[in-house]
Curated annotation (Swiss-Prot):
This is Ribosome maturation factor RimP. PANTHER family: RIBOSOME MATURATION FACTOR RIMP. The keyword GTP-binding does not apply. Pfam families: DUF150_C, RimP_N. Keywords: Cytoplasm, Ribosome biogenesis. It comes from Desulfosudis oleivorans (strain DSM 6200 / JCM 39069 / Hxd3). InterPro entries: Ribosome_maturation_RimP, RimP_C, RimP_C_sf, RimP_N, RimP_N_sf. The gene is rimP. It is found in: Cytoplasm. Belongs to the RimP family.
């Protein structure tokens, strides 16, 4: 998953060690062209159970990442960097996320149809052998991890996942 964007791949390599050193988990990286220009978004989660991501955490990571980008990716100019909490409906970006959040309600979108559909909302059963298992209306779907273009937790009735 990740679409093969080389900037996103470089960002993971540069930013993940910074986040880990600060007790944060890098959850997801986006690099998009939007109406206001190019936007680089980093989504974080706390590496400490029952602790959220604070504004100070985001600001600290932002300062460090800006410095890294200036040194290692100087060709990346004229962009906006946004650093925020992944939130209750956090993206699932790594294969291990699909195991960690087994039992949670999720939304998944695929690149190609799986059983004649591309969008799924159901209970995540886990991942094995490169396949994500999902229960939707009492039916189990097996979705190849490599076909997933977007996945996130679904927050139901204000209850965090």
């Amino acid at each position: 998953m990740g679409g093969g964007n080389p900037v996103v791949a470089q960002m993971w390599k540069l930013v993940e060690p910074v986040c880990s050193a600060e007790g944060m988990e890098l959850v997801f990286v986006e690099f998009n062209k939007e109406s206001q220009g190019r936007v680089l978004r980093l989504y974080l989660a706390s590496g400490v159970p029952d602790r959220g991501v604070t504004l100070e955490d985001c600001a600290g990571i932002s300062r460090q990442v800006n410095g890294l980008l200036d040194v290692y990716l100087p060709e990346l100019d004229n962009y906006t960097l946004e650093v925020s909490s992944a939130g209750l409906e956090r993206p699932l970006a790594k294969e291990i996320d699909f195991e960690r959040f087994a039992g949670s309600r999720v939304k998944i979108r695929t690149a190609a149809p799986v059983s004649d559909r591309k969008n799924f909302t159901g209970i995540l059963l886990g991942v094995s052998d490169g396949n994500v298992r999902l229960m939707v209306d009492d039916k189990t779907f097996v979705i190849p991890y490599g076909e997933i273009t977007r996945a996130k937790l679904v927050n139901e009735d204000g209850v965090s996942q």
